[in-house]
Amino acid sequence: MGFNSDATGIHSRSVFKFWNPSNLFRLTAANNSNRFYPASVSDSVVKTARSFKKDKHGMPTYPDRVRHRVVRTTAYSHEENEVGVPWRKNALGTYLKYGAVRSAAAYWSKYPVGTKFKIKGLPYTYIVDDYGSALVGTNTIDIYHPNLSSMRLWGNRHIEIAVIQWGDWDRTLNILAGRTQYTHTRKMYYAAKARVKSGKVARN
C-alpha cells in the first residue's frame, strides 16, 4: 500500500498550484539531464489534455482510449516506514520493483492492477502493483523509489506517459472486495465496480 508523497509535505518540488503547461516545460527541460529525469511533455499531449475534466489537482481525467497523457506524479519509498506496510512489499504482497520494470501506485479505479506504462524519456516499464490512500479520487501516479534520496529528487512532477497495457479489472475487483473494511480501499472497490458495470473500461 503505497504512501503518497503529498501526504508528507516534505518533498514537493512542484512549481504548480494548478495545471500550467508553461511551468511544466520549464521544469522538465531543466531536469532532463540523465536517465533519472523524464523528457518534456509533447505539445500535442498538452493540447489534448485541455479538453478533459480535471481532478482536484487540476489534472485531466482521460477516457481509456487516450493512452498518451500528461499526469501528475509523486514519489514514495519503503524507507518512509508507513505504518502497517511490510518492508518493501506492495499491495499484492510481492516485492516492489526497481529495475527494468518498476513499481507504481495509483487509484485502481483509474489504473487497474497490472496496468503498464512508459514515461517519456525513460527506458523503463512501470507497472501498477500498489495503491495509497492519498491517491483515492485522483489521477496521480506515485512512482516507487528504493531510497529517500531518489524519492526526494523525483518529488512532484508532471510528466507524459504512454499506457502500453491496461490492467486486469476482474483481478482488481477480486483483490479490493476483500479489503472493504478500509475506507480508501472501499472507495476504490465501489468506484472500480461502477466503471466495470458501465462498460466504459478498456480490456486491451
Question: Predicted regions span which residues?
Answer:
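Solvent-exposed, well-ordered loop and adjacent helix/strand elements within mature globular domains
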Residues: 1-204
